[in-house]
Amino acid sequence: MTTSRAGAAPVTVDRAAIEHRLITLRKAVVQLDSLGRLDGARLANDPGTGLAVERVLALLNDLAFAINRHVSAGVLGEAPPRTPAASFGAAERAGLIDAELAAALAPADGPHHVLVQLYLDAEPEEVAAVVSAARSGYREYVRQVTGWITASAPDRVV
């Protein structure tokens, strides 16, 4: 998809690649939903569940990072962000997501999957809150990115 900003040369954004990653993001959020209740007792008795949660959260982070890098580099004309946390700020500057979502998906304490790793060892009862925040954040991310793609359709100028 070719888009342009006022006064800027058109840039190319690979809409199909973004949409493909969004499909995987949606599936990963559904996988988190399917795990059900994630209380401390369950995580202590079933360590595999904690590992699965951490892996799905890492996948969500990686996919969003790839989308954010691609769109921000194309739209902003800057070097792509080097970290997932920085990529959410760049995605916000590119108009892909709003500032509130950018902040929610780049927690100050670290990425959701890293927080889960730490909490599994020390405070497993905190895992559910981290997963809930990530699940709602990535669900909203999919919604906003889908909206951006729709608004940036080939027949529309961004």
Task: Describe each PLM feature range.
Residues 1-158:
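Solvent-exposed interaction patches of small proteins and small membrane subunits
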